[in-house]
Structures are given as structure tokens and as C-alpha cells.
């Protein structure tokens, strides 16, 4: 898998999969078996969706052939499974517009300015796009780009923090880990939370305590009420309210926010697709929506007898991939098996069975 730079010029795509959770990842696999290359878009900065974000360490017992695995473990297995098909990733981006074109293709644009012109679209958005909870304080939205980052991954956070005075805002394990990740690169690291208690595993909490005692990380208790900027929009300081209700000023160069994420249906409701109670209605033979070339799989769809299970989403993704392959071919295709089909084995990059 490889990231793709965003571009205002539409990139041609055989298929775009919206949502990089387990069902979206398996959709990429099934499309790959059909010879359909996929672009994969997700609002989160990493693949895995709800599994990786909300229950990475919780056991899952109902995946066929896997007696038990964690959410993160399942995501890692799926990443290995789709590796032969090298989907193009557009992470940290949300599809904000989708429109059918006169030639039957679908034009999609993302919040990062990426434009994709696709022959088919597979919506695997689960309960909606997981987007970071925003800081609600005066002046925050006007900050210059790059001075406030929501839920950046470790590499991005460390790179942005180099030589800077950094405030990490949040109280969960992601915030604690970000403070630990930045401590060697940053000029100063402060961990800001509304109280001096953090929800994290024992190991990172022990590291945090050791670095606090060494004076390398400072914990600040308070809530952001506003920001102070230079005339050019450069972030200079946070306005805080301490536990006693007194205003405080905290100078900084970079603000990293880890306030959790929440699912939002977002613009899907504006795409002209038939819906039933905020979910996409589908044909259960193909999992096509009301618009040709657009499919919906996983928790985002609804139909009689629907069960919101990962394994059901895998079944839906399989039928959707077969349906699109036949739509593009213009005729019914023979069923092939990975155990015996040299064509499928070649696509998977494995040696034919002897």
C-alpha cells in the first residue's frame, strides 16, 4: 500500500472504497481478486476504522477460522491480505462531495482537495466517518495551517514538534503517548488536561511519571478558553482557565489535540442515494445502492434481516465485487476459486498449486 499525494486534477480510478475498517479492507481484497484496482479513503490517519480506534485490544471471537484476535490484530491480518493489490491510500481525508457524471463515472472530492474520477464506488463507512472532536474555543478555527493538529500519528507529531514548544491536549492513552513521542524532539512538552488523571496503560503512565519527575514533561491542569495569535495568524499562546477559575497564559508553538473521535454520517445524506433511517438502502443480490456503480457494504447499509457483524460485511463485500466486475464486463463471469485458478493466484502473487 502506498500513500498518494493530493491533487486538484481528478485521478482516474477503477474503484474507490470509502472507509478503511475491516469491511473496507476486505472490499479491496475482493476487488483485487476481480482485477479491479482500488483507492482507499478514510477520515482517520490510519487504516482500521472502529476496530483500530475504539477496541484495538479487545478480543473478537466470531471471525471464521480465527478463534480469537484483537481488533488491531484483525486489521493487521487484513492489511497483509490486501498487500498484493497495493491500494492507493488517501488517509486523514473525508469525502465531502460525490456526483455521478454524464459518462457514468463518479467524481469524488475530499477535504484535502483530492479529486478522484471512479468507475465505481464502495461505501464501507460503518456508522460514519470517525472525525476528531474539535477544540471549542475562540480563535481556534483561524489558526494558520500546521499549528493545530488533531490526532496526528507518532511520525507526524514528532516531525512537527521538532525544536518547538509543544502542548499536547488530552487525557487518554493517545495523548500520553504523543507527549512521550515528542519529548526527545521538542524544545518543551506540556501535557494539558482538565484534571491530573490520565487513562492509559501502566507502562506509558510510568514513563510519563518518570519524565515529569525529571522535568522533561510538564502537566498543566486547565481548559482552553481561547488562543493568542500574531497578526499573521501565528499561534503564540493559549488562554487557559485553571481549576480555581483563574485565567492563565501558556506560550507555545504547536498544539496537538487528542480529544477523542466521534462517528458522523457527514455528507453521505447529501449524495442523492436512497436511504432508510440514515442508512443506505441496497439490493441484496449486488449490494448496489440506488445509483448505478455505487455500492454500500457493512454497517452503513440496511436491508431486511440485516445484522451488523464484521463477517456479514465480508459477505456483502464479496457480492458487491462480483457485481461490479460483471457490470464492467457487461456479462456474467465464471466463478473461479483461489485454490485452482492460475489467474487469481497470479493476482495474489502466489505460486500455482501443484
From Swiss-Prot:
It holds the Pfam family Pyr_redox_2. It is an enzyme of class 1 (oxidoreductase). It catalyses: 2 reduced [2Fe-2S]-[ferredoxin] + NADP(+) + H(+) = 2 oxidized [2Fe-2S]-[ferredoxin] + NADPH. InterPro entries: FAD/NAD-bd_sf, FAD/NAD-binding_dom, Fd--NADP_Rdtase_type_2, Ferredoxin-NADP_redctase_2. FAD binds at residues 42, 50, 55, 95, 130, 299, 339. One of its GO terms (molecular function) is ferredoxin-NADP+ reductase activity. Keywords: FAD, Flavoprotein, NADP, Oxidoreductase. Binds 1 FAD per subunit. The keyword Zinc does not apply. Its cofactor is FAD. Its EC number is 1.18.1.2. Homodimer. Belongs to the ferredoxin--NADP reductase type 2 family. This is Ferredoxin--NADP reductase. It comes from Acidovorax sp. (strain JS42).
Amino acid at each position: 500500500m502506498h500513500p498518494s499525494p493530493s491533487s486538484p486534477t481528478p485521478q482516474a480510478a477503477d474503484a474507490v472504497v470509502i472507509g478503511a475498517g475491516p469491511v473496507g479492507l476486505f472490499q479491496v481484497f475482493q476487488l483485487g481478486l476481480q482485477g479491479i484496482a482500488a483507492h482507499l479513503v478514510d477520515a482517520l490517519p490510519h487504516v482500521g476504522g472502529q476496530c483500530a480506534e475504539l477496541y484495538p485490544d479487545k478480543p473478537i471471537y466470531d471471525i471464521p477460522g480465527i478463534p480469537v484476535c484483537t481488533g488491531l490484530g484483525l486489521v493487521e491480518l487484513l492489511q497483509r491480505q490486501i498487500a498484493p493489490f497495493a491500494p492507493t491510500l488517501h488517509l486523514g481525508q473525508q469525502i465531502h462531495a460525490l456526483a455521478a457524471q454524464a459518462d457514468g463515472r463518479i467524481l469524488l472530492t475530499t477535504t484535502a482537495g483530492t479529486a478522484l474520477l471512479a468507475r465505481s464506488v464502495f461505501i464501507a463507512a460503518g456508522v460514519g466517518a470517525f472525525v476528531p472532536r474539535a477544540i471549542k474555543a475562540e480563535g481556534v478555527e483561524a489558526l494558520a495551517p500546521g499549528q493545530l493538529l488533531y490526532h496526528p500519528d507518532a511520525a507526524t507529531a514528532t516531525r512537527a514538534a521538532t525544536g518547538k514548544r509543544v502542548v499536547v491536549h488530552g487525557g487518554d492513552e493517545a495523548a500520553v503517548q504523543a507527549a512521550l513521542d515528542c519529548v526527545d524532539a521538542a524544545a518543551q512538552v506540556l501535557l494539558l488536561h482538565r484534571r491530573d488523571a490520565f487513562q492509559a496503560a501502566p507502562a506509558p503512565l510510568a514513563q510519563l511519571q518518570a519524565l515529569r519527575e525529571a522535568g522533561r514533561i510538564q502537566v498543566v491542569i486547565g481548559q482552553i478558553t481561547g488562543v493568542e495569535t500574531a497578526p499573521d495568524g501565528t499561534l503564540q499562546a493559549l488562554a487557559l482557565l485553571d481549576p480555581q477559575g483563574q485565567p492563565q497564559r501558556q506560550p507555545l508553538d504547536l498544539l496537538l489535540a487528542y480529544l477523542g473521535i466521534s462517528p458522523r454520517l457527514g455528507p453521505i445524506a447529501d449524495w442523492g442515494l436512497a436511504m432508510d433511517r440514515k442508512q443506505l438502502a441496497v439490493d441484496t443480490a449486488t449490494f448496489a445502492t440506488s445509483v448505478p456503480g455505487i455500492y454500500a457494504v457493512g454497517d452503513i447499509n440496511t436491508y431486511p434481516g440485516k445484522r451488523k457483524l464484521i463477517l456479514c460485511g465480508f459477505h456483502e463485500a464479496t457480492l458487491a465485487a462480483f457485481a461490479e466486475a460483471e457490470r464492467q464486463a457487461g456479462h456474467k463471469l465464471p466463478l473461479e476459486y483461489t485454490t485452482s485458478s492460475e489467474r487469481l493466484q497470479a493476482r495474489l502473487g502466489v505460486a500455482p498449486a501443484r
